[in-house]
Amino acid sequence: MALDVLVVGGGLMGASAAWRLSARGHRVTVLERFGPGHDRGSSHGTSRIFRLAYAEPSYTELALRALPLWRRLEEESGRAVLTPTGAVDHGPPEVLERLAEVLARAGRPGRRLSPGEVAERWPGLRADTAALYHPDAGRVHADDAVAALLDAAGRRGAKVRHGGRVTEIRRTGGGATVVTDADEALVADAVVVAVGGWAPGPAAGVVSGLPPLRVTQEQPVHFPVPDALEWPSFIHHPGAGLRLPGGVYGLGSVDGVKIGLHGAGPVVDPDDRDRTPDPAALDRLRTYAEEWLPGVAGTEPEPLTCLYTTTPDEDFVIDRQGAVTVLAGCSGHAFKFGPALGELAADLVEGGPGLPRFALGRTAPAR
């Protein structure tokens, strides 16, 4: 039976849910507070890492589920959204051993490389004590991906409304009512809340068990070098030669070689944040590049900002209570899974079970 579904939020998670719900024949309307392609949240920019390499097998399985969906999205939208680049993980050998084990079990084995082999293949990148190369990784074109998701949903009948903030969600009978700041009341069979760092507002009063969400302003940088698109994605895990908590990630993009610290930014209010670059954060990344990225020598980094919305255990929230499904807590690593998360949301809207790892009210310890 086709349902009337309101999706609150048109970033990665909301757009993914809209596409997969509309693909199943549901009548979908997306309510996006800001304008098309806005830079107020976590889904903007030119690049995100796609990778299969995770220490937790469930995430590798989820990435494998997302991969054919990204390709299907490209076919439906006519847009290229995922470019294969391969990826290099380097750092403590025990970390790489675990990644290699998970990849091998998934039938996607990586290749171990010495620092010298890394330097020979990618002269711009200096590896730590050991490295693991996995060819199935790539670069997701973030802005294009969100636009493609909404476009593909629209081709299947979904409507997208920009402007107007959702002020309240109420359960009504077997469905829900969404109230906007224009005093408009919209009634639906189901509501999907996918508003990133703003989730505690609309979700208040209609779901319980939402974990604390830590909203931070992150500050990656681009080094504008001409060969940026030839670089692999890379993750430098802390320990061994790196003492930055959370490690450093990087990848090539049309804007240059992008690097950033994982979850190292200050806590902010998503409605009231200063986007002025933090000189100390910029210096940390500049110092890192001087030691580990000889390929960007002589270029000045260009900073940008975005939001992380992080749960205590860095697992996502994807769960339903009644007619309301919540997608939140991307925790700085959700983009690669986008369409697969949309599938999980569609399952929940249709009454299917969720994954315990992503449940509301879970008691997983903080990492």
What are these regions (language model features)?
Residues 291-367:
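C-terminal catalytic lobe of FAD-dependent flavoproteins
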Residues 2-3, 180-190:
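Core beta-strand elements of the Rossmann-like FAD/NAD(P) dinucleotide-binding domain
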Residues 23-42:
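Glycine-rich FAD pyrophosphate-binding loop
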Residues 19-23, 80-82, 197-322:
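Active-site substrate-recognition segment that forms the wall
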Residues 90-162, 168-173:
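Flavin (FAD/FMN) cofactor-binding and adjacent substrate-gating region
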